[in-house]
C-alpha cells in the first residue's frame, strides 16, 4: 500500500476566537483508499473482527487483491480493491453482490453488513495532535488504536488522535445497508483545547422568564499532557446573563468531556425588550496560561413556542434537555391544573422537532424527552430512566394534574411507549403508541449474529434472560388498568403494521380497553391535511380525544403485575415485589379486592411481596382482613398505613419478611452489568501495569458515552480514588489485580478471582492464559454501590474485556461473563462461563453455565 503524502501548514493563535472557529473548517481529506466487504453483520452485535485472517483490525496492512472469506459475496470471497472519494464521500464499492437475493432470503436484515477502508497518511512534521471526524463510520483505527466514529453522521464527533512523524495507518470500519459511504476528515491542531460548539446542549431563553439552568459544552483536550487548574467563564456583552466562573482541577490528555456549566439570567432579563431570535454568549476556557474562546448561540423564544429546558441527569450529572409546548393561551392560575402529554420521538428526531409536530392544546402541556440522543437507547435503559426523570421534572415545574398524565410516541418512540407504558403502567392514565415496534426479535431479528450461529443454547438463554424485558408482548397483562390507543399506517414499510396488529390482538383477547386505528394508504410518517391538529401520525384528533377522556385510576381493585427483572421495575399500583423465587424468570402477581375485608392473590415465582397502604386505604377497611393466597387462607388485623408483607417459606406463604444476609439482591442492587451505569459512576484505570492501555480503553468508552448518550463520566487513576469517591459512585475498573491497584485491593472479597493462569468462579477453576472477564458486584468497600471489573488473564484478554461496551440496547450482558479471544469471531459462541449471582450475591450452579 503506497503512502498518500499530504501536507498542511496551518498556524493558529491559541488565544484568538478565530482559532477555535477555524480549526475544523480546513480539513485534510484523503482521496485514494483500499476497501473490502461486505461481511454479514448481525443486528446489535459488537466486538466482531472480520479481518482476523490477516492480523485483525488493529494490525492489518492490506494490499490490492488480499482476500477474506465472506458468505455475502460470490464464491464466498471478498478482496481489497481501490476506491476513490467522490465529493468527500468514500464509497466502499462492493463487487458483484446480489442484494436482491439476500433480501429475498433474509428480509431487510440481509442488507446489513460491515465493510472496511484503509489508507495511510504521511505526516511530515513532529508529533502533533489532530482532530478526526469520521462521519457515518462505526469506528476507526489510527496506528492500531481504536477510536469512535460519528456513526449516525451528525457531524459533531471530533476526537483527538496523535499524529506521529512519517507514516500513519488508518483503518475505518463502516456498517450500514447494502453499500454504505463515509467521510474522513483530519484537522491537525496546534492548540491545547477545542471547544466543540457543534454539540451544545443549551436551554432556550424565554422572553419575560428568568433562567437558572445548565449548558452542556464538549471540550476536547488536544494536548499530550494533562491540563491543570482550568477556569471557565460564561457571560454576554449585553449583560443579560449573570457572569459565571467555574474551576476544574484537571483534564486528561486526548479526552473529550462534555462539561456542565451553570447559566443564569440577570434580573434585567424578564423586563428586557429583546426582539432578536438569538443571544450570543461568550465562553472562555483558561488553562496553563492560555485562553480559548467560543461564541455560544442561545435561541430566544416566546413562552408559547416549543422550547428547550435543560437539567442535570440523575444518572451522571450530564446536561440533558426536554422540549415543552405549553397549552394554548396559557396563563398561570393557582387553581388550574393541566394534563401532561409525554411524547417520545422516533430514531434521528430531536425532541424539539417532536414538540413542533404538535398543535398547542388548551388542556395539556406537551413535553418531549430526548432518550439522551436522537437515536439514543430505543427508550430502554438510559432512555427509559430519562423519561421517568423528565416526568418528575415536568410535574414539579408546571401545574400538572397527576391523574391526567399520558404517554405517546412514534416509531422508536412508539416502541418506547409500549416499553415504558407496560413497565410503569401506574404512571399514566392512558398510552398511545404510533407505528411502534414490539421487540428487537420482531423488528430487527438477531439471527445473523455470530453468537446465534456459534453460541450454545444454554449460554444464549443467559443472554436472552436479560433481553426479555424489552419485549412488549410479554408484559401486555400489565395494561389491566391502562387504556391503549394504537395508531398505524397500513402501508408502513419502516415499522410494518404486523406489530400493531399483534399487540392489539393480545390486548383485545385479554378484554382490556384498547382502540386500534389502522389508517388506509398511509406509510410511516404521514399527515392528513383535512384533519385538525399538527402532524396526524402523532397529533391525530381521535388519539388526542382518547387520551383526554381518561384519568388515572391510581387504586384499581384488580392489579396484574408481571416482571422478569426487579432492577427495571418492582412496583405497580399497590403491589410491590421484593424478591423472586427464581431470578430472571417471569413473576406474576394477580391481586383483587373481593370486598372491604378480603383480598384474593395469585403469586407465581414470587418469594416476597408487599401490598402498599396508600392505595389500600381507599379500597379496604381497618380490622380483620382475609387473604386468599394461591388458595391458601391467611388472616390478619390491618390498620391504615400498615404494609401487608407476604413471604414464601417451605412452599407456603406467611405474613412477614424473609431473612436477609449481609448481601442481598434488592431492586437497587440487583444487576445485571448495565445497572452499574444507571446511577452515578466513575471510570478507574489501572496504573500498576499497562497504564496506557487501560487509560485508552477508559477514554474511548467515555467518548462513546458522550456521543451515544450525551453523557459525562470522570476518569480517575486507581491511585486517585478517595473514600469520598467510593461512597458516592459505582466504580468501573479497568484492569485486573495485576495492573489495577484497586482491583488488587478488592480481589480477596470478590467471588471471581483472576490470575495469570486462569479464573476462579466461586469454587469453579477455569484455566486459561487468554481469558477475558467482566462482572458486577457490590463494592466490598461500600456495599450500597457497585464495582464492575473489566479484566483478563493477559493484556490481550484484558483489552478485549475493557473495550467491549454495553452502551447500547440489546446487549444482554448478565452479572458475569468469562470468554476467550475467539469472541472477535464467534461473539457469544466464545463464552466459557456466564450467568447471574444468586439472591445472596454468590455463585450458584442454577444461575450460571460453565462450558
Language-model features and meaning:
Residues 600, 611-614, 619-851:
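Solvent-exposed alpha-helical segments and adjacent loops
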Residues 491-493, 497, 501-597:
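C-terminal catalytic histidine-bearing segment of alpha/beta-hydrolase fold enzymes
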Residues 122-141, 170:
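Aromatic-lined ligand-binding clefts that engage carbohydrates, nucleic acids, or primary amines
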Residues 15-16, 20-101, 169-204, 212, ...:
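Accessory carbohydrate-binding/adhesion or oligomerization-edge regions at the termini
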Residues 337-397:
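Active-site machinery of serine-nucleophile hydrolases
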Residues 202-203, 239-337, 671:
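A domain-start/cap signature at the N-terminus of enzymes
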Residues 329-336, 380-412, 422-428:
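Gly/Ser-rich "nucleophile elbow"/oxyanion-hole loop immediately N-terminal to the catalytic nucleophile
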Residues 429-476, 481-482:
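Mobile cap/lid helix-loop segments that gate and shape the active-site cleft of serine hydrolases
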Amino acid at each position: 500500500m503506497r503512502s498518500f503524502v499530504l501536507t498542511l501548514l496551518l498556524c493558529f493563535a491559541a488565544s484568538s476566537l478565530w482559532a477555535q472557529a477555524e480549526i475544523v473548517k480546513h480539513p485534510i481529506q484523503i482521496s485514494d483508499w483500499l476497501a473490502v466487504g461486505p461481511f454479514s453483520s448481525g443486528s446489535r452485535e459488537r466486538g466482531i473482527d472480520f479481518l482476523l485472517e490477516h492480523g485483525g483490525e488493529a494490525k492489518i496492512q492490506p494490499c490490492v487483491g488480499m482476500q477474506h472469506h465472506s458468505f455475502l459475496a460470490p464464491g464466498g470471497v471478498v478482496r481489497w480493491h481501490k476506491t476513490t472519494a467522490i465529493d468527500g464521500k468514500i464509497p466502499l464499492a462492493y463487487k458483484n453482490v446480489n442484494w436482491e437475493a439476500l433480501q429475498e432470503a433474509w428480509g431487510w436484515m440481509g442488507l446489513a453488513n460491515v465493510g472496511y477502508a484503509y489508507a495511510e497518511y504521511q505526516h511530515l512534521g513532529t508529533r502533533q495532535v489532530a482532530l478526526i471526524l469520521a462521519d457515518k463510520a462505526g469506528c476507526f483505527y489510527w496506528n492500531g488504536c481504536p477510536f469512535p466514529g460519528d456513526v449516525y453522521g451528525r457531524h459533531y464527533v471530533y476526537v483527538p488522535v496523535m499524529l506521529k512523524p512519517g507514516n500513519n495507518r488508518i483503518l475505518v470500519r463502516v456498517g450500514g445497508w447494502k453499500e454504505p459511504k463515509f467521510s474522513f476528515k483530519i484537522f491537525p491542531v496546534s492548540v491545547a483545547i477545542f471547544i466543540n460548539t457543534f454539540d451544545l446542549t443549551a436551554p432556550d431563553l424565554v422572553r419575560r422568564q428568568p433562567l437558572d439552568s445548565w449548558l452542556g459544552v464538549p471540550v476536547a483536550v488536544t494536548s499530550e499532557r494533562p491540563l491543570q487548574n482550568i477556569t471557565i467563564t460564561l457571560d454576554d456583552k449585553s449583560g443579560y446573563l449573570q457572569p459565571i466562573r467555574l474551576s476544574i482541577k484537571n483534564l486528561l490528555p486526548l479526552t473529550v468531556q462534555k462539561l456542565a456549566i451553570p447559566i443564569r439570567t440577570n434580573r434585567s432579563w424578564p423586563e428586557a425588550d429583546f426582539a432578536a431570535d438569538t443571544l450570543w454568549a461568550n465562553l472562555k476556557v483558561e488553562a496553563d496560561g492560555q485562553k480559548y474562546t467560543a461564541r455560544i448561540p442561545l435561541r430566544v423564544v416566546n413562552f408559547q413556542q416549543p422550547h428547550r429546558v435543560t437539567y442535570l441527569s440523575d444518572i451522571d450529572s450530564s446536561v440533558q434537555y426536554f422540549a415543552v409546548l405549553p397549552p394554548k393561551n396559557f396563563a398561570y392560575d393557582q387553581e388550574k391544573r393541566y394534563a401532561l402529554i409525554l411524547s417520545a420521538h422516533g430514531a434521528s428526531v430531536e425532541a424539539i422537532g417532536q414538540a413542533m409536530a404538535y398543535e398547542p392544546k388548551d388542556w395539556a402541556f406537551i413535553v418531549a424527552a430526548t432518550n439522551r440522543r436522537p437515536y439514543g437507547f430505543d427508550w430502554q435503559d438510559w432512555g427509559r430512566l430519562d423519561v421517568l426523570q423528565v416526568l418528575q421534572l415536568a410535574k414539579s415545574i408546571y401545574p400538572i394534574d397527576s391523574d391526567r398524565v399520558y404517554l405517546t410516541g412514534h416509531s422508536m418512540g412508539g416502541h418506547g411507549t409500549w416499553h415504558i407504558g407496560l413497565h410503569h403502567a401506574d404512571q399514566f392514565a392512558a398510552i398511545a403508541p404510533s407505528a411502534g415496534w414490539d421487540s428487537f426479535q420482531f423488528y430487527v431479528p438477531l439471527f445473523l449474529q455470530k453468537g446465534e450461529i456459534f453460541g450454545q443454547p444454554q449460554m444464549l438463554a443467559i443472554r436472552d434472560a436479560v433481553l426479555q424485558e424489552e419485549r412488549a408482548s410479554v408484559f401486555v397483562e400489565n395494561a389491566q388498568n391502562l387504556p391503549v390507543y394504537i395508531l398505524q399506517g397500513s402501508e408502513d414499510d419502516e415499522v410494518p403494521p404486523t406489530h400493531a396488529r399483534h399487540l392489539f390482538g393480545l390486548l383485545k383477547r385479554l378484554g382490556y380497553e384498547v382502540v386500534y386505528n389502522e389508517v388506509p394508504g398511509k406509510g410511516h410518517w404521514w399527515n392528513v391535511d383535512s384533519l385538525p391538529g399538527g402532524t396526524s401520525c402523532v397529533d391525530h384528533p381521535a388519539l388526542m380525544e382518547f387520551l383526554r377522556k381518561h384519568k388515572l385510576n391510581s387504586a384499581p381493585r384488580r392489579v396484574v403485575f408481571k416482571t422478569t427483572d426487579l432492577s427495571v421495575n418492582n412496583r405497580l399500583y399497590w403491589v410491590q415485589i421484593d424478591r423472586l423465587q427464581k431470578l430472571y424468570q417471569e413473576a406474576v402477581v394477580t391481586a383483587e379486592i373481593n370486598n372491604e375485608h378480603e383480598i384474593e392473590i395469585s403469586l407465581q415465582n414470587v418469594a416476597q411481596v408487599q401490598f402498599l397502604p396508600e392505595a389500600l386505604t381507599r379500597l379496604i377497611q381497618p380490622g380483620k382482613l382475609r387473604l386468599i393466597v394461591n388458595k391458601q387462607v391467611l388472616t390478619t388485623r390491618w390498620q391504615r398505613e400498615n404494609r401487608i408483607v407476604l413471604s414464601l417459606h417451605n412452599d407456603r406463604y406467611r405474613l412477614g419478611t424473609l431473612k436477609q444476609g449481609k448481601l442481598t439482591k434488592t431492586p437497587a442492587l440487583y444487576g445485571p452489568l448495565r445497572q452499574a451505569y444507571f446511577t452515578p459512576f466513575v471510570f478507574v484505570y489501572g496504573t500498576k501495569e499497562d497504564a496506557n492501555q487501560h487509560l485508552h480503553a477508559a477514554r474511548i468508552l467515555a467518548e462513546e458515552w458522550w456521543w451515544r448518550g450525551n453523557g459525562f463520566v470522570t476518569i480517575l487513576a486507581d491511585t486517585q480514588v478517595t473514600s469520598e469517591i467510593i461512597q458516592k459512585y459505582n466504580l468501573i475498573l479497568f484492569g485486573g489485580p495485576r495492573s489495577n491497584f484497586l482491583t488488587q485491593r478488592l480481589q480477596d472479597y470478590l467471588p471471581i478471582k483472576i490470575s495469570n493462569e486462569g479464573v476462579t468462579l466461586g469454587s469453579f477453576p477455569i484455566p486459561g492464559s487468554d481469558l477475558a472477564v467482566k462482572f458486577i458486584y457490590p463494592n466490598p468497600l461500600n456495599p450500597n454501590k457497585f464495582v464492575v471489573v473489566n479484566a483478563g488473564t493477559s493484556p490481550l484478554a484484558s483489552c478485549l474485556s475493557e473495550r467491549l461496551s454495553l452502551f447500547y440496547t440489546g446487549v444482554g450482558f448478565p452479572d458475569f461473563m468469562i470468554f476467550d479471544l475467539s469472541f472477535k469471531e464467534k461473539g457469544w459462541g466464545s463464552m466459557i462461563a456466564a450467568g447471574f449471582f444468586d439472591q445472596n450475591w454468590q455463585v450458584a450452579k442454577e444461575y450460571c453455565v460453565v462450558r
